[in-house]
Amino acid sequence: MRIDSFQAEVARVALVAAGDHGFALAGGNALIAHGLVERPTQDVDLFSPQAGAPGAVSHRVRRALASAGFRVEVTRRPEESAGEFAQLTVSRGEAMVLLDLARDWREQPPAGLDIGPVLHIDDAVGSKVTAMVGRGLPRDFIDVAGTLGRPAASS
């Protein structure tokens, strides 16, 4: 399975707009991009390790998406989380996706894939294990199960 084309377009535009703040595709779409899982996703997660990065880029990302023909609504303002999280609802026609801009730790530099920077496979898996333990949604268990048995990318 490939990343949904609408979500991929949203991710590409947002990653370019936020590029100088270290954002990379994360969450389920990162695992899909690495070929570890096959499932539909409901959101696009972009993570940066830089303090305040979501707050610093949210307006720029909104403008870039609007210029690319998307309708953009602010779902959660970065001010609600000291600049560490922002959520946008992005739509065009009948297609809609939540775009999450968040600060998150990473150990490895992102992988450069066709879509743009994507969390290193080890960091993508680690983030999903953390999500599985922390929130325990079915999709987190599906994602972690999809990574079982894969060779470690680093030692």
Regions found by a protein language model. Name each.
Residues M1-S155:
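Compositionally biased terminal segments of proteins
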